[in-house]
Regions:
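Surface-exposed, charge/polar-rich loops and edge strands
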Residues: 1-139, 149-398
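Extracellular attachment/recognition segments
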Residues: 142-143
Length: 398
């Protein structure tokens, strides 16, 4: 199976750059797997597509402002050409860091820019001044002369966060160890920026802190560096309407990490490997899911992150005596890669946004609905000018 099998034509103007004023005013393409029919709807119709007794499963992970701007200490300066913008940033010590996954009490995996010049042993200082300066002149577009650049001593004194590079991963990511602070996430909330995906061609704005977050994201479930975007369409009223229809709602957590930004570099789909992402399923959620499966009720997953969590959890358990899948409560790390040929054990229906060409998320949707069906649906969505990707419209497959 080739990655090119999952390519499709997408005009650039259909990539949503802004969130809609009303979350629930997005469009919804309804795809029936049995009839392969499409129906153009609005998301406000979604509750009517659910059945009494369905179990709707949400990912309640909370996005944090994971993009940090800082300065390096300059302890390991390397000779670089000032003609290159990234090299100029390096000479001035400017660094952009995208935290992707917490791997220890003070340790994080991160993407670093300019990446090739930041070696093990480097120290990076983060302050409010760094953040403001980066928005005025984004990293890798710095002026070749910045006479007001502070020196290393001043940076260290002003820093509210300090990290040392302690490792480098196989995909180019760095491992950072942060010096302890009283409340790490509170400091990141102050200094950080919303990690909008690269296809949103603008800087983040204050309103993105609300709109690039589901209304049901829980404060205690903070840890995602990208939103579980299928959930962005929900409002409290929509959730109330769903409950009134006799639909049960369960929540789990999967912290969206580096895999969201990871392109597929191989030609054969089967050779691709996903990064691990942390997840947790509570005792209450596990009971809800197992009861629905035992009673042969539909499990409706909101988003690909929910699908991966459910199917990974089920893959760790044997079938019940009745031959149904089960999940266990607990925490772990999921690296399940779902593409056509995968046998779904838990999910009966899927709400998902429109995904990038040749992406692992499109492969997951194709595994669930059939590649040809999904590509036909996407061609219809392009023709009808649906909005694509994170701030775009959605599709319900049943």
């Amino acid at each position: 199976m080739l990655v090119s099998d999952f390519d499709f034509y997408l005009p650039e103007e259909l990539i949503a750059q802004e969130a809609l004023a009303d979350r629930s005013s997005s469009r919804l393409l309804h795809l029936s797997r049995s009839t392969v029919n499409f129906e153009d709807r609005k998301f406000v119709d979604f509750p009517s597509l659910l059945r009494s007794g369905d179990l709707l499963v949400l990912n309640s992970s909370r996005v944090f402002p994971a993009r940090l701007y800082g300065h390096r200490a300059g302890l390991h300066a390397q000779p670089v050409s000032p003609r290159n913008p990234a090299a100029r940033d390096f000479l001035h010590g400017r660094v952009e860091v995208m935290l992707t996954r917490q791997i220890g009490p003070q340790e994080w995996q991160a993407l670093v820019r300019p990446g090739r010049k930041i070696g093990v042993g480097e120290k990076i200082f983060f302050s409010a001044a760094d953040s403001a300066r980066a928005l005025a002149a984004p990293v890798s577009a710095a002026s070749p002369s910045e006479p007001n650049d502070p020196g290393s001593a001043a940076l260290a004194q002003a820093a509210e966060l300090t990290a040392e590079v302690i490792g480098r991963g196989e995909f180019g990511e760095r491992t950072l160890r942060f010096e302890p602070v009283p409340n790490f996430f509170a400091t990141v909330e102050k200094l950080g920026h919303v990690p909008l995906p690269p296809y949103i061609a603008r800087e983040d704005r204050p309103e993105d802190r609300e709109r690039y977050q589901t209304v049901y994201a829980r404060a205690e479930a903070i840890g995602s560096v990208a939103a579980p975007t299928a959930g962005l369409h929900f409002t409290p009223q929509i959730l109330a309407d769903i409950r009134e229809r006799g639909v049960e709602i369960a929540e789990l957590t999967l912290h969206v990490g580096l895999g969201t930004f990871q392109p597929v570099h191989v030609e054969n789909v089967e050779e691709h490997k996903l990064h691990r992402e942390s997840f947790s399923i509570s005792d209450a959620a596990a009971r809800q899911i197992n009861r629905a499966l035992a009673e042969k009720r539909r499990v409706v997953a909101v988003g690909t992150t929910t699908v991966r969590t459910l199917e990974f959890a089920a893959s760790q358990n044997a079938l019940s005596s009745a031959g149904t899948a089960t999940v266990s409560a607990g925490a772990g790390e999921a690296d399940i890669f779902i593409y056509p040929g995968f046998k779904f054990r838990v999910v009966s229906a899927l709400l998902t946004n429109f995904h990038l060409p040749k992406s692992t998320l499109l492969m997951l949707a194709s595994a669930f609905a059939g590649r040809e069906n999904v590509l036909k649906a996407y061609a219809h969505a392009v023709e009808e000018k649906y909005r694509f990707f994170s701030y775009g419209d959605c599709m319900f497959v049943e």
